[in-house]
Amino acid sequence: MDLTAQVNSILQEYAEGVDKLVLDVEEDVSKEAIKRLKKTSPKASRNGGHKHYADDWKVDNRSKKQYAKIIIHNKQYQLTHLLENGHDIVREGVVVGHAAAQPHIKPVESWVKSEVEKRIREGLE
């Protein structure tokens, strides 16, 4: 076996190891993110309007070639922006109040970004 083939073999093996590491980290962190979102999401309103919101967080894994695309979403997607950022309460076209923001996505998003990077760095050492 010549030097070029040996180097290519070593690089291929390394690349496959990195790909597996990244996929494993993405899967583990996304599962933990779902747990955190379910724990920190608003549970119910006074009128029971979104009582299942906290339980509706899901992970979709969509592989694209060797890279995974992890999507974390809520089935009640219409509520995510309203709950995260707050919104006006309108009755019959008149603003009657304001619902305060309940930030629960942004803290988990920040954690996911730092945790993925940290775990990949640790795995490569």
Segments the model singles out, each with a brief description of its role:
Residues M1-H73, Y77-T80, N85-E125:
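Short, Lys/Arg-rich flexible segments
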